Amino acid sequence: MDTIGVMRVLLRVSLIAVASCVLFPGCRNTPPPAACGPVPSQRQQQWQALERYAFLHFNMNTFTGREWGLGGEDPAQFDPTALDCRQWIRMLKAAGFKGAILTAKHHDGFCLWPSAYTEHSVKNSPYKDGQGDIVREFADACRAEGMKMGLYLSPWDRNRADYGKPEYIEYYRNQLRELLTGYGDVFEVWFDGANGGDGWYGGANETRTIDRNTYYDWPGTWQVVRELQPGAVMFSDGGPDVRWVGNEKGFAGETNWSLLKRADFAPGAADREALNAGQEDGTHWLPAEVDVSIRPGWYYHEAEDSLVRTVPQLLDIYYASVGRNASMLLNVPPDKTGRIPAVDSLRLMEFARALAAEFSKDLAADARVSASNVRGHSGKYGAMRVTDGDTATYWATDDDVRNASLTVMFDQPTVFNRLLVQEYIPLGQRVRKFRVEALTADGWRTLAEETTIGYKRILRLPTVTAKEVRLTVEEAKACPLISNLQLFCAPDVPASSGGTVAALPAAVPSANAVL
């Protein structure tokens, strides 16, 4: 072929390519949507993907029978006889938890590690003749089992004579430095909101109050964590990375924005309703963590062995936390021997089996999916992205389309009663209102009308047989981005007694209570 012939062939190919892009716009390079409002950091995204992790309240209170120690307890009282951190972590891992947070120091000031800054620690207890380091054993167990490790260090210290004075802040930060440099990677640092009140305080036996907003100089303390554990998220009533959900009963708001006006909040100084629902116009990405105990109290008490939450209650908590754009932090307290009791272990394994049954088969995975609008008609943002098993891809609409729908179409009428949907949160939380409908033998039927989605929303729906299921985003702050849509048929589980989640007895102080 001569030069002219080659040029004619190349021109013909070019014209075909251009025509294809005109007829099939999906081959165009459609730009991605712009971010909408505050967006999560990488550490926040990694944290929320854990979904379920455990709290381990184990400290002096385990042996005194209290929930909040006064600070003057004798270290000799701390004497676990068969402590086994590997037992804790193996059991939690088997039950599907991805990490655990240990109370390294609670309000009484007793330290589970041999801190160089106080004598009120395991080094003066009978445990291993004063040579023990439970934080070390915990860290080693997490590392061996591939579990994430988190640490709780109470800001309030009822043992210290200098609590309430400026010099205590340096003491607190020194202990924080010990924990964040000596035990490996930490995924979460937990700052409690309980601050100030009566206590031993070096023998003063008095009540002390502090300014919750200014005393701790929180920005300076947060900087210590950022420098020593840059991958860790920090929890408190006001973040800076993760917020308290505003209660310890086990539920996030049905409307739950991962946004908050952070400057208006501080540990121990918070609007609980705002914490529960988040704030659509929030200035920072601050997702919620639901902390709740498997027992009425946070610490082990033998009298509560018959009061461990039931599987239906634990499922309620799961749906009201992970299922409402939050994480689930379930407290599982070791007993006086230093092991998690058999009744708690059994209940957690039953819970794990129940969860597996709830989500055993994704019915949408093999179905066809269509959308009322696709961004730039591009396959990159097509409806099939919500069922491709990859949450890094997503269905998106054109910028000016904020009301749009996805329709899942089955080959045969299919029975389902659960819907799981996720937004693509790296570009922000957008959906304000959505609706779920099913095409049954009697026509289209509305199953749910809800508000926010966020990282994940899971709906318990009535059991229906449908040929099609439609998710309609009715209102959004910007063009909706949906990364995942799944449907399941869960078995019948007896409803939990006494409502969604049983409340803590009035006599048990809240771990985040404001005195």
What does each model-found stretch correspond to?
Residues 2-14:
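Bacterial N-terminal signal peptides that target proteins for export
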Residues 5-6, 18, 502:
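Serine/threonine-rich, low-complexity intrinsically disordered segments
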Residues 18-33:
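Bacterial Sec-dependent signal peptides at the C-terminal "C-region" and cleavage site
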Residues 30-390, 394-400, 407-408, 420-422, ...:
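Mature catalytic domains of secreted/periplasmic carbohydrate-active enzymes
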Residues 398-404, 425-494:
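Trp- and acidic/polar-enriched beta-sheet ligand-binding modules for extracellular glycan
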Residues 403, 411-418, 466:
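Extended extracellular/luminal ectodomain segments enriched in beta-structured repeat modules
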